[in-house]
């Protein structure tokens, strides 16, 4: 809206807005662009640029760019996108073109991790181009699904034209939402958790998850079959790839199925566009995933790999049955 109002004031067209982001964004951004007729401009990730880090940004940003999305905890791998580095790339673009492009930080996961265990990392309003931040209460905020938060740098950064005022509830009330009636239970629970645990309590919870993720990634890194994509140093999420081995008769999808038989849901999937030839497997560590559980998982992982290594022929790849039928 800020972009549109500025363009209208300058008597310039407003019919082709675009949003720049990594090709590894969560599907919510694809939905946003689709629903609101915004052109998505995806900056491809690669093995050299595993996240949006400012590389090639000048090829995607122009006068119709309404913003750049930086992700604190990429869905595919859990890695942080370096917000400060992205901001510096936008500074260089502004010096050359005069375009003042702002950053929205998608902190769905990292927004509830970085403040507690990485306090010195500049990703928030300490970065001058960051004007809004969103996060989820139900990922690492320790609240059940359905709660999300968004904050702006200043009140003026939320355009007044987006706020509606209603008077039929017994007094004038501002509302900013796509829907109207929403349950308040999640908000109350988040408030309770903040009061109950406090900053130090959240720090201890998130640090424990982080320590477990680092233990798991360290154990997996020592196995000959795998190479880590990342090690869970950002949010407690990490992914790994299968090493090349000419006579191997299985892949990560086979390992996923074997782990599922033991009760572990560890998804395997291709990386996004331009990197789909790379398949990874990912672990998400959250509150409640104890060190004892991590040790049990590593034991089962090694058992599954040993079973698959003992196959005389490749696993069948057609019409694989799922363990879920409900």
PLM region spans:
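A short small-residue
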Residues: 66, 70, 189-196, 282
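Non-catalytic terminal extensions of PLP-dependent enzymes
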Residues: 199-326
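Predominant activation on well-ordered alpha-helical scaffold segments within soluble catalytic domains
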Residues: 1, 30, 84-87, 187-194, ...
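Catalytic cores of large soluble enzymes that bind and process phosphate-bearing ligands
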Residues: 21-25, 49-52, 74, 78, ...
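Active-site C-terminal subdomain of aminotransferase-like
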Residues: 112-236, 241-246
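Conserved PLP-enzyme active-site core in the AAT-like
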Residues: 1-164, 169, 185
């Amino acid at each position: 809206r800020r972009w549109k109002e500025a363009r209208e004031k300058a008597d310039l067209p407003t019919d082709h807005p675009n949003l720049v982001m990594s090709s590894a964004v969560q599907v919510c951004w694809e939905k946003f662009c689709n629903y609101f007729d915004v052109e998505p401009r995806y900056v491809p990730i690669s093995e050299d640029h595993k996240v949006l880090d400012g590389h090639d940004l000048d090829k995607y940003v122009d006068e119709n760019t309404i913003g750049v999305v930086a992700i604190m905890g990429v869905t595919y791998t859990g890695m942080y996108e370096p917000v400060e580095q992205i901001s510096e790339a936008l500074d260089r673009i502004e010096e050359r073109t005069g375009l003042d492009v702002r950053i929205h930080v998608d902190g769905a996961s990292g927004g509830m991790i970085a403040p507690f265990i990485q306090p010195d990392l500049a990703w928030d309003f300490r970065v001058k181009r960051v004007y809004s931040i969103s996060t989820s209460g139900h990922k690492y905020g320790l609240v059940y699904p359905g709660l999300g938060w968004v904050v702006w740098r200043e009140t003026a950064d939320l355009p007044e034209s987006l706020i509606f005022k209603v008077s039929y509830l017994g007094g004038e009330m501002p509302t900013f939402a796509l829907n109207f009636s929403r349950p308040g239970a999640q908000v109350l629970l988040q408030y309770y958790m903040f009061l109950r645990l406090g900053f130090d309590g959240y720090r201890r919870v998130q640090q424990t998850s982080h320590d477990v993720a680092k233990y798991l990634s360290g154990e997996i890194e020592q196995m000959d079959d795998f190479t880590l994509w990342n090690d869970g140093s950002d949010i407690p999420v990490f992914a790994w790839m299968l090493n090349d081995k000419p006579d191997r008769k299985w892949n990560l999808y086979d390992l996923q199925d074997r782990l599922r038989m033991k009760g572990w849901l560890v998804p395997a999937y291709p990386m996004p566009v331009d990197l789909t030839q790379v398949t990874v497997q990912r672990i998400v560590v959250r509150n409640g995933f104890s060190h004892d559980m991590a040790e049990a998982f590593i034991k089962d992982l090694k058992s599954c790999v040993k079973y698959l290594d003992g196959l005389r022929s490749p696993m069948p790849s057609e019409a694989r049955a799922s363990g879920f039928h409900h």
